[in-house]
């Protein structure tokens, strides 16, 4: 079975961390199938980074207080849980915060190694008076989902090391709805609209791409049971279909001069696809096909967004504007007379 039109996905940004994605047209019923799978994957399985444990100078446990600080350790930990970080490292990384009062301590005061970034520097952590001093060492790790503090407490943890709950997921909220959409005479196709909101550490489009990659990997396991099994085939994308149509055009549709057209036909070049498969050097080897004909062909192809096999990127037809002149007409007439002889 072949879907009449390949589904397309478009992004409608709401702001930097929120976008709506529209996927259509989908076969009837596939809107809910795809929407539910993507939503659950986005909320549970997108990799991210978070603080897993910390150590505060002079503090042995989370029920302590820090001299000169307005907040107790429990309040500081609650604030640190809101820290949005990203890490390019697979192994744990240590970030530091050292501050002397009087001042407000924010995430902007954190010193992180290369590859680790704090995305909400305005986050309030603590308030110190003139006698206050705060030194915190935090461990940042990569993971996914939610991990409670009990699981972050590893055997052999040093005294004073406080494990905390870690929320790795960079996705905050995902909703979706399915509407009916029309394809030609059928009105029962699905239109899936997904609303994705993320933390500043990841763009919504990157979260969607990550979820899609995860689902492809998992569904691939099922496909491996029988790679020759029949299923629904997705048609070519509109751009691929348009390109295929252009390549199938006969060279008559290029409206070339008589000389260029006859030379190409004599060489056995009948379609645009056969023409773009040739290089400029190949065409110059054709009898009576000179540089002027080359420029004409390149200009016609550039108007279609195509080029010869060895044409340099960014060929600008505006720099070589070809138009048939009286001399070209006379040259074609001489060519025709020669051919008739």
Swiss-Prot record:
It comes from Acidothermus cellulolyticus (strain ATCC 43068 / DSM 8971 / 11B). Its EC number is 2.7.7.6. NCBIfam families: PRK05182.1-2, PRK05182.1-4, PRK05182.2-5, rpoA. This is DNA-directed RNA polymerase subunit alpha. Residues 1-226 are annotated as: Alpha N-terminal domain (alpha-NTD). Pfam families: RNA_pol_A_bac, RNA_pol_A_CTD, RNA_pol_L. It is an enzyme of class 2 (transferase). It comes from the Bacteria. DNA-dependent RNA polymerase catalyzes the transcription of DNA into RNA using the four ribonucleoside triphosphates as substrates. One of its GO terms (molecular function) is DNA-directed RNA polymerase activity. Belongs to the RNA polymerase alpha chain family. Residues 241-341 are annotated as: Alpha C-terminal domain (alpha-CTD). One of its GO terms (cellular component) is DNA-directed RNA polymerase complex. One of its GO terms (biological process) is DNA-templated transcription. The N-terminal domain is essential for RNAP assembly and basal transcription, whereas the C-terminal domain is involved in interaction with transcriptional regulators and with upstream promoter elements. CDD domains: RNAP_alpha_NTD.
């Amino acid at each position: 079975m072949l879907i009449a039109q390949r589904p397309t996905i478009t992004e409608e940004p709401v702001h930097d961390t929120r976008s709506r994605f529209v996927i259509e047209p989908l076969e009837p019923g596939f809107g809910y199938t795809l929407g539910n799978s993507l939503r659950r994957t986005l909320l549970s399985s997108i990799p991210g980074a978070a603080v897993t444990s910390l150590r505060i100078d002079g503090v042995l446990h989370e029920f302590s207080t820090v001299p000169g600080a307005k907040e107790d350790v429990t309040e500081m930990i609650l604030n640190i849980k809101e820290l949005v970080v990203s890490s390019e490292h697979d192994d744990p990384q240590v970030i530091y915060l050292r501050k002397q009062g009087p001042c407000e301590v924010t995430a902007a005061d954190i010193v992180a190694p290369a590859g680790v970034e704090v995305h909400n520097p305005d986050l309030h952590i603590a308030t110190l008076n003139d006698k206050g001093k705060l030194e915190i060492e935090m461990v940042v790790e990569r993971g996914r989902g939610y991990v409670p503090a009990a699981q972050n407490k590893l055997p052999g943890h040093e005294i004073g090391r406080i494990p905390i709950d870690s929320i790795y997921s960079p996705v905050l909220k995902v909703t979706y709805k399915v509407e009916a959409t029309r394809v030609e005479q059928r009105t029962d196709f699905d239109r899936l609209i997904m609303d994705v909101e993320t933390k500043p550490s990841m763009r919504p489009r990157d979260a969607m791409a990550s979820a899609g990659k995860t689902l492809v990997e998992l569904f691939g396991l099922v496909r491996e049971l029988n790679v020759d099994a029949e299923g629904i085939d997705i048609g070519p994308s509109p751009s691929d279909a348009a390109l295929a149509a252009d390549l199938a055009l006969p060279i008559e549709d290029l409206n070339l001069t008589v000389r260029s057209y006859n030379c190409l036909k004599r060489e056995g070049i009948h379609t645009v696809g056969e023409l773009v498969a040739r290089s400029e050097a190949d065409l110059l080897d054709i009898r009576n096909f000179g540089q002027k004909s080359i420029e004409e062909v390149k200009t016609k192809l550039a108007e279609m967004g195509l080029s010869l096999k060895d044409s340099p990127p960014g060929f600008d037809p505006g720099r070589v504007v070809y138009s048939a002149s009286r001399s070209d007409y006379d040259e074609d007439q001489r060519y025709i007379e020669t051919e008739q002889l």
